[in-house]
Structures are given as structure tokens and as C-alpha cells.
């Protein structure tokens, strides 16, 4: 497993990785026959996407960074859509000033040193408000981390998605027109729709603002997940997304937080100190950050987006405290 991690990490960071959710990857790009030496290696969303998230941004990944590159977006009628274009490294990004309309066609055009390039996409029906917020209460949704787009740490998403062996369950515990409360749980490794009763539940301490119905964001809170069979702490876990019109799914789900790398040292940097993983990723320009507990710069920022969380029929999240887990004989050895 250690050699898999190192080989994969080197390959993905050095070469740019593989296809991400809803993105296209041309494997390094091609040069323009007119003589332009730059090219587009990936876009997000993919050209022709028919179910884009209504709060999505647009990204064009270039072979070579261009500080002056820009993106403009128009709707199906050709009207300009307000937004901000920016460049981070070799990625040109555009974010809308307001959420896009549901079930609407858009075209994004990149202007850079080569000829302008465009992609087209259509948003899904997600975006219309839930008529009765209370109808969401009791619904449980399964969030599959392995199916998301790993935005951070950059370049190593394929490795993390291959090692994350569990998902997250989210239950709506109360909801009204302005706020929504949720409780989370780590899913069992054997069944992504079942709760791991030997792990404490994620008790988000603050209700989420639901004034942008159907969009919500809940958290932050701390939890533990399994990576290659090792328990890893995630600090400041926050989850966001938007409910589908009939409440049977959460679309555009995103998860963010910071992951403690120290338990991964035996897998990735055997024989090294607490900073073994951080030293390795630093050689590829990926910095570790200070952990939330103040113990040192041993954590990596984690962000996963573009997930769909389907409702679990008959699902139920049972609140579990540390004492519950400790006193449960079936949890011995966990």
C-alpha cells in the first residue's frame, strides 16, 4: 500500500491527474495547428454536460499558465451572465455573481493566446425552492466521497478517492423557511447506506442558513473517517448542497475541512517523523497547514465537490456519543 501511495502521488502531481467529476481531461493537451503553443487540457463542466449544478463555476485548465486569460458566459439567448473571471496557476476560473437559472443552457468562452474556445452546458432542474421545508425532516442522504471532484489537495484527488473507504450520512432533523439543522454520521464500510455505530455522530452545532432555499451549508464540526483502514481526523468539516425539487437528493454537494496527515505517515513516509507526509507533498508545491488543535502544520486542506447524495429509503441516523461507543461491546477494538 505504501508503494501505491507514493507512486500514485508522484504520477498524479507531476502529470496533472485524471478526469474529475463532470470534467474532461485531454491527457496534457494538444498544440494549436496555427502555431499557438498553449492548449486546453481540461474543462469543468465538461462540454455538453446536461445536468450541471446551478451554482457551478467554470474552469479551463491550460497547458501553460496565462495571467491575462479570461472567461465570459452567456445564456441560451446570448445574454451575458454576470460573473468574475480569475486565474490561479494554469487554471482559468469564472464564478457567477448570482446562482444560475435551473434547466437553462449556457455557453462559456475562454479568451487566451490561442483562438477563443467555448463549451456549452445545461443546468439541471435543481434550483427551484422546496415548497414545504418541513417535508425534508427525517430524510437521510448518503454522500459518496469517492464520487466527488477533489479540488484540494490539488493533483492528488485520484489517490484520496481510492483510499477513502467510507461515505457520510446526513439526516435533516428540523427545517423551516430560514434554517435547517442536520446530524451526520460516518457510513459503514460494508454498506454506504448504513451508519457505522462505532463512530461518534457529527453533531453540527449551528443550524444552517436556509434562506437561499434549496441551498444550504452546515458546519463546521469535527469527525473521523477511514483512509486505507486508518482513522483520520477531519477538522472544521462543512457540507453544502441544494435539495432536488422533490427532496429525494442533494445535488452539487461539497465537503470541506482539513485532514490530519500524521496517521498516514506509516503508509506514505515510513520511518519519518510527524511531518513525513507534509515533507513529501511539499516537494510538489502542496503546503500543509496548521491543524485546528494548534499542534502544528501537519494538516492538508480538503475540498470535495460535485457530489450527488441520494436519499436513503427508510434511513435513520442514530445519535452516538463517545460514551455510547466506548460502552458498546460490539465496538471493541475500533
Residue spans for each PLM region:
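Small disulfide-bonded, cysteine-rich extracellular recognition modules and tandem repeats
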Residues: 18-19, 39, 48, 76, ...
Amino acid at each position: 500500500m505504501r508503494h501505491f501511495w507514493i507512486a500514485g502521488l508522484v504520477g498524479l502531481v507531476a502529470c496533472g491527474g485524471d478526469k474529475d467529476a463532470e470534467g474532461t481531461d485531454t491527457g496534457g493537451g494538444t498544440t494549436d495547428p496555427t502555431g499557438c503553443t498553449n492548449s486546453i487540457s481540461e474543462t469543468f463542466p465538461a462540454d455538453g454536460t446536461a445536468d450541471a449544478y446551478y451554482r457551478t463555476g467554470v474552469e479551463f485548465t491550460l497547458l501553460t499558465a496565462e495571467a491575462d486569460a479570461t472567461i465570459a458566459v452567456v445564456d441560451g439567448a446570448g445574454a451575458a451572465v454576470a460573473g468574475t473571471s480569475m486565474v490561479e496557476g494554469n487554471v482559468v476560473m469564472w464564478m457567477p455573481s448570482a446562482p444560475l437559472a435551473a434547466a437553462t443552457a449556457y455557453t462559456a468562452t475562454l479568451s487566451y493566446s490561442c483562438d477563443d474556445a467555448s463549451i456549452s452546458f445545461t443546468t439541471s432542474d435543481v434550483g427551484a425552492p422546496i415548497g414545504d421545508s418541513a417535508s425534508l425532516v427525517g430524510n437521510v442522504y448518503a454522500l459518496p466521497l469517492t464520487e466527488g471532484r477533489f479540488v484540494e489537495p490539488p493533483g492528488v484527488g485520484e489517490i484520496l478517492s481510492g483510499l477513502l473507504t467510507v461515505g457520510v450520512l446526513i439526516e435533516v432533523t428540523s427545517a423551516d423557511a430560514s434554517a435547517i439543522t442536520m446530524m451526520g454520521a460516518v457510513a459503514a464500510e460494508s454498506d454506504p447506506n448504513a451508519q457505522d455505530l462505532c463512530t461518534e455522530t457529527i453533531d453540527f452545532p449551528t443550524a444552517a442558513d436556509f434562506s437561499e432555499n434549496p441551498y444550504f451549508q452546515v458546519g463546521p464540526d469535527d469527525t473521523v473517517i477511514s483512509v486505507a483502514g486508518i482513522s483520520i481526523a477531519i477538522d472544521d468539516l462543512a457540507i453544502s448542497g441544494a435539495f432536488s425539487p422533490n427532496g429525494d437528493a442533494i445535488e452539487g454537494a461539497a465537503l470541506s475541512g482539513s485532514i490530519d496527515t500524521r496517521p498516514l505517515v506509516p503508509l506514505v513516509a515510513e520511518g519519518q517523523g510527524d511531518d513525513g507526509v507534509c515533507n513529501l507533498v511539499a516537494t510538489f508545491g502542496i503546503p500543509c497547514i496548521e491543524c485546528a488543535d494548534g499542534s502544528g502544520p501537519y494538516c492538508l486542506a480538503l475540498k470535495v465537490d460535485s457530489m450527488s447524495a441520494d436519499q436513503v429509503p427508510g434511513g435513520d441516523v442514530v445519535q452516538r456519543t463517545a460514551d455510547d461507543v466506548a460502552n458498546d461491546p460490539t465496538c471493541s477494538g475500533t
